[in-house]
Amino acid sequence: MTKSELIERLCAEQTHLSAKEVEDAVKDILEHMASTLESGDRIEIRGFGSFSLHYREPRVGRNPKTGDKVELEGKYVPHFKPGKELRERVNLG
């Protein structure tokens, strides 16, 4: 599901809200989540899961085109860990 598909589905379910209100709400939620992760904080949504940052150690990679070794710097990457309820729901469906 894309962001625009999510907005369309929410508009269909929440008929008392305008499409612009739904779009703004979705964009605000995603922006708040991104800025929370950017500041190094964790996001926990009970029953759904948690978002956090994991550190990837510096390593030696390869250029896929030439095969040359390339030094890759360490970096933080977003990580999602599904909650128990979400895992169970996915496994039943």
From Swiss-Prot:
One of its GO terms (molecular function) is DNA binding. SMART domains: BHL. Keywords: DNA recombination, DNA-binding, Transcription, Transcription regulation, Translation regulation. GO terms for biological process: DNA recombination; regulation of DNA-templated transcription; regulation of translation. It comes from the Bacteria. Disulfide bonds: none annotated. One of its GO terms (cellular component) is cytosol. Pfam families: Bac_DNA_binding. PANTHER family: DNA-BINDING PROTEIN HU, INTEGRATION HOST FACTOR SUBUNIT BETA. This protein is one of the two subunits of integration host factor, a specific DNA-binding protein that functions in genetic recombination as well as in transcriptional and translational control. NCBIfam families: hip (TIGR00988), PRK00199.1 (NF001222). Heterodimer of an alpha and a beta chain. Belongs to the bacterial histone-like protein family. This is Integration host factor subunit beta. The gene is ihfB.
